[in-house]
Amino acid sequence: MNRYKFNDIENRLGVYFNNPSLIKTALTHSSFGNQFKDAKYNERLEFLGDSVLQLCITEYLFNKFKDKSEGELTKIRSLIVCENSLYEIAKKLSLGEYIRMSKGEELTGGRERMSIQADAVEAVIAAVYLDKGIGFVNDFILLHFEEMINKAINNEIVLDFKTKLQELLQKDGEILIQYELLKYEGPPHRRKFFTNVIINEKVMGIGEGYSKKEAEQNAAKEALKRLEKNYE
């Protein structure tokens, strides 16, 4: 990571590292370590960051919502720290631009892959914790996860839009839901898919994504937005 990129990611995160090697490692995928044998990669930091994130979110929810049960708090926390939520945080911070990975991984779409970006968020959290301590990283997490926390509390995070759509439509009995691949474009390593969702022979949503599954989920998400007002 060159000096320009290092300064840029520090500015995006709002963290200025005493030990720059921590953030460099946090943004190094294991494929890069396989290609360059001396490179340290982020899997150990990811392991630590997962626990730090869980602790900070758990403590925040425990202190904030004294009237909620253990089950309710667990559900809210699971929405905040799930892969989908971490991916949204990664996109907001543009972490994908800074992750070091092998050329092979990048050519197969690794830079856009949800799991790689979500893992990088956890690794960055660990890097901040090791460099700045628990108080600082707690503030860091609450700052960058504030929107996700509010969405989880208000039950606005849906992990599986296709299932949510199915459940919503079951209220009206048997309804036929179909997903149709419209087209795909781009080179094989960066192919984007476009899909629509058809409900009782009517197109209700169109979605796109870097996999067929992601495109279908986004189509279902659009359909939900159009339909849910009718069920309020």
From Swiss-Prot:
EC number: 3.1.26.3
Top-level taxon: Bacteria
Organism, as annotated: Clostridium botulinum (strain Alaska E43 / Type E3)
Record family assignment: Belongs to the ribonuclease III family.
Pfam families recorded: dsrm (PF00035), Ribonucleas_3_3 (PF14622)
Species lineage: Bacteria, Bacillati, Bacillota, Clostridia, Eubacteriales
Residues that bind Mg(2+): E46, D119, E122
Protein known as: Ribonuclease 3
InterPro entries registered for this protein in UniProt: dsRBD_dom (IPR014720), RNase_III (IPR011907), RNase_III_dom (IPR000999), RNase_III_sf (IPR036389)
Protein's cellular compartments: Cytoplasm
Gene Ontology BP, a term: mRNA processing
GO molecular function list: double-stranded RNA binding; metal ion binding; ribonuclease III activity; rRNA binding
